[in-house]
Amino acid sequence: MPGPTQTLSPNGENNNDIIQDNNGTIIPFRKHTVRGERSYSWGMAVNVYSTSITQETMSRHDIIAWVNDIVSLNYTKVEQLCSGAAYCQFMDMLFPGCISLKKVKFQAKLEHEYIHNFKLLQASFKRMNVDKVIPVEKLVKGRFQDNLDFIQWFKKFYDANYDGKEYDPVEARQGQDAIPPPDPGEQIFNLPKKSHHANSPTAGAAKSSPAAKPGSTPSRPSSAKRASSSGSASRSDKDLETQVIQLNEQVHSLKLALEGVEKERDFYFGKLREIELLCQEHGQENDDLVQRLMDVLYASEEHEGHTEEPEAEEQAHEQQPPQQEEY
């Protein structure tokens, strides 16, 4: 049943039909051709499984330019895709309504914010029956190769599902500033470098000493003054060395603490991933427990907050004493 507008895929088949229901709402159908027959599936995405490098594979610079052009971002490196925000907007572009851009953190700077965005992306993949497994644990690290592999796959997924409709990414974000995440390669613990001459104890004395008058012979400093100045310089050098040692120890302890937290996070993330795989294996059995587990895994922070509010209101309502009637 063809609709008023159609889009042709590269093989000549119609990729989308647009029809209207009884209420006049525009509903997209996506269809596939199997053995010469046309079959319709409601809201299904076209899955892409090929990840081999071909002539159509874009370079790192071309892929970033493509991302910035399509969704109006200002990314400069592939590693900045680790925030997941760009993928969320791509899904909203390909399948309007499958994800809420209000929940996407376009200004994400921390790893837990990246994970939040990828949880939203996972939920949209599940909603559209996308079979691709998102390697969240690798992507949020901001490593180049992991993020390049995923965006290369997503480019092919985009080409297979985009129907050519117009899309305004800035308007879709509703005014949210899409600030690129910081470069993951930057060192957090780098100390600012200062000029050795500026820190020299004799630099201030050289600037403050008045210019010698012409014709006058400058007096030589006594041995006592030279000894005192050299002693103060050695003491200041020792103080600076002690301060550097203390700062290095603090940096080392912070790095150890960070490694411990990351190991603990990876451990629990692996457990959740195993639970997710088990739920996906038994998802076709229509088990209520499996469905409830999937809802918990893919629930966003805002959704969890809303589910707790009604319970709190009910408890508050039960604790209120009954009002007395006025006579």
Curated annotation (Swiss-Prot):
Residues 57-159 form the Calponin-homology (CH) domain. Residues 236-306 form the EB1 C-terminal domain. It is found in: Cytoplasm; Cytoplasm, Cytoskeleton. Residues 1-21, 171-240, 299-327 are annotated as: Disordered. Transmembrane segments: none annotated. InterPro entries: CH_dom (IPR001715), CH_dom_sf (IPR036872), EB1_C (IPR004953), EB1_C_sf (IPR036133), MAPRE (IPR027328). One of its GO terms (cellular component) is microtubule. Residues 187-327 are annotated as: DCTN1-binding. The keyword Manganese does not apply. Its main location: cytoplasm. Interacts with DCTN1. Interacts with APC (via C-terminal). Interacts with monomeric and polymerized tubulin. Interacts with SLAIN1. Interacts (via the N-terminal region) with BAG1. Composed of two functionally independent domains. The N-terminal domain forms a hydrophobic cleft involved in microtubule binding and the C-terminal is involved in the formation of mutually exclusive complexes with APC and DCTN1. May be involved in microtubule polymerization, and spindle function by stabilizing microtubules and anchoring them at centrosomes. May play a role in cell migration. This is Microtubule-associated protein RP/EB family member 2. The gene is MAPRE2.
